[in-house]
Amino acid sequence: MIKIFRCECRRLLCNKFLIGLLAVLLFYAGQVFYAVALPGVAHTAPFSPWSFGAYLGRLLPLVWVGALFFLTFFTSARERRAAVLTAATPADPRRYALARCAAALVGVALLCLAALALAALLYARLFGWTDWGSLALPALVILAPPLVFALGSGWLLGRLRPWLLYVWMLLPFALE
């Protein structure tokens, strides 16, 4: 299963789409940082958990879309045709699906880490502030539940009808 996981990670992470998505995410993250986190939220310091949470909350819809786009690699028409071949292998289909979902989770983690690294760079450069222990909990609480939900629900919707993933991408924007 490690070989399948590596192959799926390489397929997801070594393409032009990820580079474009990272570029858009980092540009948007920089804009959000300067517009939201830098002035502070509710008269708090820019490096307070409150301001950092507002920064991550604004980035969450874009990361949600990125997570679901990763799943579209596994639900495309080409993948459905290849599923006949993978079903004929002796590998357990559940373990194969778990390896693919884990690869998508690695891609989502990479997107989140890019946004967190940009914030760390800007906090260190602008304020000389590096106390990340106080912001780890807000990052985990804000990012983990919705993104795990996006991957799980997107996986189920994509197995039903692949086009439902694109409709599901609109959810965070409809809730704003």
Feature-to-residue mapping (PLM):
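Aromatic- and glycine-rich beta-strand/loop motifs that create alpha-glucan
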Residues: 1-25
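Hydrophobic alpha-helical elements at and bordering transmembrane segments
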Residues: 5-9, 96-97, 136
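Pore- or pathway-lining transmembrane helices of multi-pass membrane proteins that form conduits
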Residues: 19-25, 161-176
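Secretory targeting signals
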Residues: 27-74, 98-168
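Helix-terminus/helix-capping segments at the ends of transmembrane helices and short amphipathic helices
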Residues: 77, 86-87, 158
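Short helix-to-coil transition segments within interhelical loops
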Residues: 86-95
